[in-house]
Design a protein with these regions (language model features):
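Active-site loop/helix belt of alpha/beta enzymes
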Residues: 1-92, 168
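C-terminal accessory subdomain/extension
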Residues: 91-206
């Protein structure tokens, strides 16, 4: 048995509702003497000890994600990678992926990775060809051989194409793994590129 509640605006430390909920929860939990109580998930933990009560419920904090937007007190520990199944040389003027939405402005080297939206790698991370994209969202990146490499064209059901032209020759080969998020690309930064939050990224992949 547990007296339980949840802060609806815990990820906004300045929200007056946090203090109001805290006081209400104190009154409720006091009415259940001898029963443990819990108010805070990850975001509430960072509001201070008064929000902790008998136990806390860390979720995204366990993965080193941002429980509070812009606050990065933890080291990211979750990593997602995809295997490169093919490297292709492509000529200037060629097009990439469905709809030919991305046209190459230079001779390019493209890495095709075995991950797509069926695996939870969000289609909104596509480099181009997403009609709903606004100016604030530029598309996704991968990380390999010390380089951030952009997604080009639309992410498909099972495959994603990365432009590895700027990675030195021989540094990327079929069979290598490309980081989708991890220590070099925090999940929350990738999520922002997709127009969403780290929670969705972590719960979608699989």
């Amino acid at each position: 048995v547990l007296v339980l509640s949840h802060l609806h605006s815990g990820d906004t430390p300045s929200a007056a509702s946090n203090k109001a909920q805290l006081e209400s929860f104190r009154q409720v939990s006091a009415a259940f003497e001898g029963i443990e109580s819990s108010l805070s998930a990850s975001a509430g933990i960072f509001l201070g000890p008064e929000y902790h009560f008998d136990l806390t419920r860390p979720g995204i904090a366990l993965y080193g994600g941002e429980a509070v937007n812009g606050m990065k007190p933890l080291r990211p520990v979750a990593t997602a990678e995809a295997r490169i199944v093919q490297i292709r040389e492509a000529a200037v003027g060629g097009t990439v992926s469905y709809g030919a939405t991305h046209q190459l402005e230079r001779a390019s080297r493209l890495a095709i990775a075995s991950v797509g939206y069926a695996d939870g790698y969000l289609r909104s991370l596509s480099g181009s060809g997403i009609p709903l994209r606004t100016g604030g969202i530029a598309g996704g990146f991968g990380f390999i051989a010390g380089h951030h490499v952009p997604v080009v064209g639309r992410i498909t059901m099972d495959l994603t194409i990365f432009d590895v032209t700027d990675v030195p020759d021989g540094a990327v080969r079929s069979g290598d793994y490309i980081e989708l998020f991890g220590s070099n690309m925090p999940v929350d930064e990738v999520a922002r590129a997709a127009g969403t939050i780290g929670y969705e990224m972590l719960t979608s992949l699989g």
